[in-house]
Amino acid sequence: METNKRFFTTPIYYVNAQPHLGHAYTSIITDIAARFNRMCGNDTYFLTGTDEHGDKIVQAAEERNTTPKEYADRISTLFKELLPGLSISNDDFIRTTSSRHIQVVQKVLSRIYESGD
């Protein structure tokens, strides 16, 4: 039986506020699609994570008398902890502040720049 590769991702959730029902809903719907594809024998990868850049995060941190990094760490942890509580089967959780994410983005942008695009 031939397997097909499938890649599923939620939006990377913005950490300016705590997770809510909409985040849970999106994660569950994506999880259903990923599980179905695994059941069909497809090589399936399911990614989710958090976007930790932007003025709204700085503003939320300032309102709570903390740094944007400390605030993002706290809220990102809430998003990550939401997943097992909902039995979400994601393969990875990425944070836009993580070194591995930064390295990949730099590599992609360098390739684009070098190709003249």
Where would I find each of the regions flagged by the language model?
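N-terminal, positively charged nucleic-acid-binding surface of large information/translation enzymes
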Residues: 1-117
